[in-house]
Amino acid sequence: RKRPPQRDAEADGVIEGRNAVIEALRAGTAIDKIYLAKGDTDSALGHIANTARANGVVVVNADRRKLDEMSRTHAHQGVIAVAAVRAYASIEDIFQRAEERGEAPLIVLCDELSDPHNLGAVIRTAECAGAHGVVIPKRRSAGLTAIVAKTSAGAVSHIPVARVPNLTALMKELQKRGVWIFGAEMNGNTSLYEADLKGPAAIVIGSEGSGMSRLVAETCDFTVSIPMKGKINSLNASAAAAILLYEAVRQRLS
């Protein structure tokens, strides 16, 4: 079987091999995830895992077949890192942006959006609508990879994207800071056109397959339903985000 043509590893943020990954960690490169060969007990891989975790990087144990599929050089030595295209922002960066604009915070929370195209499209929508930031969880989510950046049409460079260990814990923190949380849900308890999005608001967008996770949905102040008039009963993540965000824009302009 012919090998696929090697792609430009630098262009899509893939860093392969033990020395290259260790050097990237030492240099403080913004790394999205590190994939390690499952079951490999080599001390060098253990050192990489410990260093990564100490720096807050997500470490994923993957079988060698997955690493072989990801590899561009076919010499990954049991470790592949995927670099983030830019450093993650903090929650404070998002609040600061709202303060600088003299606006009530408008934040998008992405619950387990694992498809990078969906995440990129949501980030693009959020930036266009003037949201102050996007938040993703560290696990079970796409990160700021090259695919996400490309799908966002460059929006990742213009809006803060923060990454948190626990989305539910962050939601509770936002609530303490006076932010109302609205989750998009097919059978929501509030109609889109009855939701008051003029004040400090966070909009939660769940995954296309299963929507919001149970704990996230339970932590929302309101679950918001979008009127559906056709035979298809769901929208993709970026379309749902666009509808809620632009309803917030409409309310804030009027």
Predicted ranges, named:
Residues R1-R97:
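N-terminal positively charged helical leader segments and presequences
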